Amino acid sequence: MATISRKTILALAIAAASSAHAAPAPSQINVSGSTRIEVATGNFTSMTLTGTANRNAGEDGIDFDGPQISGNFVNDANFNLSGNNVDAIGIEDDSADGAIGGSFINNGTINANGYNASGINIADTVIGQSGVTDDAIGNVVNNGTINVTDTSGIAPVDEQAAIMLENVQLSGDVINKGTISVQARNASGIKVDGQDQDPTDTVKYATIDRDVVNTGTISVTGQNARGIELNMVNFGQDVENGGTINVNGAGAVAVRMDRSDYNRILNTGTIRAVGANSIGIESRESFGNNAVSQGIINNGTIAADGVGIKVTNDLLQTGPGETSNASNFYRITQNAGVISGGDAAIDGNGQTILHLNGGTIIGDIEGIRDAFVNGNVAIYSGLIEANKLDVTAGKLYVAEVTNVTGDMFVRNGAGLSLFVNNSTDPSKAIVEVDGKLTLEQGSVIGVTTNPGQFTKESTKYVLVSADQLENLGAQVKTLTPLLAVTNVAFENNSVTANIGLATGSQAGEGLANAGVDRNGVAATKAFIDSVLAKLPVNSNLYQTFINANDAELRQLARQLQPETNRAAQSASLAATGLTNSAIGSRASSLGANSGDALIETGAWVKVLHGNSDQGERGGIAGYDADSTGLIIGADGKLNEQTTLGLALSHVRTDVSSDTGNDTDVATTLLTAYGAWEQGPYSVIGSLSYGQSDNESKRYIAGERAKGDYDSNVLAADLSAGYTIKLNENLDLIPTLASRYAKVQIDSFTEKGTQAALRTGSQSLEVFDVGGGFKLEGVYGDFKPSARLMAFHDFAQDSADTTSAYALGGATFATTGAPATKWTYEAGVGLDWTKGNYTIGASYDYTRKADFNADTMTLKARYDF
């Protein structure tokens, strides 16, 4: 590649002139230096700019006079400019129109500061190749950063923009993937202008054959700021914004189509206009395609202090009764996201068909021929100015008092959903229809609440009124189980109903329909009658519940319930299980078979750690539990066959429920145990009694209910085995075992929230019978062991609970998680004995349906 470094203007001119008599060559120009570079008309296969241009005040970056480039024009250079009327890259037509056969691509950083300063200015240039279909050519692309600042406050005499395209012919796209920032009056981020220098000239001189796409960021600040503007452009394609366009200033417009027809304006990003009379998207005397999936489409955010989307077309007559150009209308489609405007969300100029398929509209809707609701749409609009509003499918959520100027239809299966709160005037219709309102059979008028205080007393509201009402079989009902709708009447061209806080019995069916489980329905019904009806309307609990949607209500209903997942009971059972496992392994090593015939009396200590995970079972949320404990014991031989012992254990268990609740349980157990052996037969048993101190914390709507209560546990364990010697070192012991445990929890009353519960006493029994195999070996000083057992619970007890709210009211019952029939256990251990000392470690694994637990034990023993 031929590199053109910093040359004089004359040298560049000579080089360009001589190229007319030689084959075009690729050119690379290093733009570094303090004065501008001028490139005369010439032929090039491509053009690349490199370096960093730190120019003197008033000096441009680089100017081209009608370059003829068969390939791409790529800027990899950086420009820092200051002074009046400067631009970084200029392509003019002083001697000839320019031509770029490929694309113009900016990868650099441009900083231009001064009155009427600009970034890139391309005029009277053909970019691309007519009739050639190639996405890589014909484009103007910004991948870099362009900053333009003009603090003079004086309107520019020439067009001012970060990227200015005047009278250009593009066979491709205009694409911004980078960052554009402009601070100036009457300036644009990207502007394509097809008007000649004579402002009265109505001929379009600019053409874009493909799309205008922004996936980057465009920010323009100043009076009459423009984000993207197409003025008198032969276009007919798409403007797509998947990035961010922000404009700020009086009269600012984020996206403006001025006498430039288009196929579609699609927003999936953010378009925001701040300032008096600002506009998000403006279509001025520019027609869009009105076919399905065309026109102006929003899937993102369009917000303006003035008007979100504005249509202006003085070329059409839109007065009352006007029928000329009846087919020339605009199509606006709201699929998702938000369209909002301080003056109006949408102004269709009487020429627009509006399709509302989803999302939210904030602000008045004006100038609409026909509006169709085809999905779930929320509107915060005082005015819907439309000849016809047709709710064909889904639900139209009306969040404030709204006037519909034309006729309105609510079709079969569709709904009109109205929000009420204390600011709603009961005597004034929430939706007032100036024309005829038709409610088809199967249509629904729903009532719900929006954030704000709502009185508990049943009050008569005017839901809908019309100049003429035709009810063909509409249903009026509540959309939240916490409200009751009664005394519905269709009279005097109005729909009225009494609305108030529902009683528990009234709310039951709605709670179930909202997906609240059986326990949640019981707890919520009691809460409504016993607590909610007594709360001030401005309390946290009241506001949280009354304004909850279905998903939030399901969560709140779970929070209201007492713990029904057996977590507290399981914590006490875990303490007995850990203790009995430790004592069982100790007792099994006492007899003659173990090779410890000389042992008469000894003391031992074991350190325990276990963790368990209970998954959801029977629709009841699970929990995780971590246990740590210490056991101290002593035992001795009563005779050659019998050994008796006593142990004291203390186990702490922290339970974290999947609902977010916590329970801490501290259990102290006293255990008597013994072992008997006669030949190959052995029997091991234990009896334990203990007490637990329980501290529970439940969380309801961000408030904590704390409980402090006691429980006691009784447990017994008995097993019998028959020893089969596999060899001189290893024994196999088939084993039968049974175990029983009962946990009794005292009644208690929570504190800390008005949703606190008074919970009755509870009990839970487990009776396991099972069998399995044990392996015990002696290899010198080492004694390995292993076991595999299976148990069946014949008690099948569940943790059912009877509770009432501490504020009073009737009790309600909740059903606990169902018991597990089968339990499977496996364990391994290893002891090492030297003289009178023994140390060892063991690991046990427990598996049930939706449950698993791990236990690790370290032990030490001294024999007297």
Segments and roles (model prediction):
Residues L535-E728, D831, S842-R861:
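Outer membrane beta-barrel translocator domains of Type V secretion systems
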Residues T45-A53, G71-N80, G101-N111, I137-T149, ...:
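Right-handed parallel beta-helix
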Residues A2-I4, T8-L10, P24-I37, N450-L630, ...:
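Outer-membrane translocation/initiation segment of Type V secreted surface proteins
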Residues F104, V140, V174, V239, ...:
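Membrane-embedded beta-strands of outer-membrane beta-barrel proteins
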Residues A25-E38, N54-G66, S82-D97, N113-T133, ...:
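Extracellular beta-strand/beta-solenoid scaffold signature
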Residues R617-A625, D658-N661, D693-D710, V743-E765, ...:
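Solvent-exposed, glycine/polar-rich loop segments of beta-barrel outer-membrane systems
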Residues R369-K460, D467:
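Extracellular beta-strand/loop-rich repeat segments of large surface/secreted proteins
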Residues T671-A675, L726, K751, R758-F864:
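Outer membrane beta-barrel transmembrane domains
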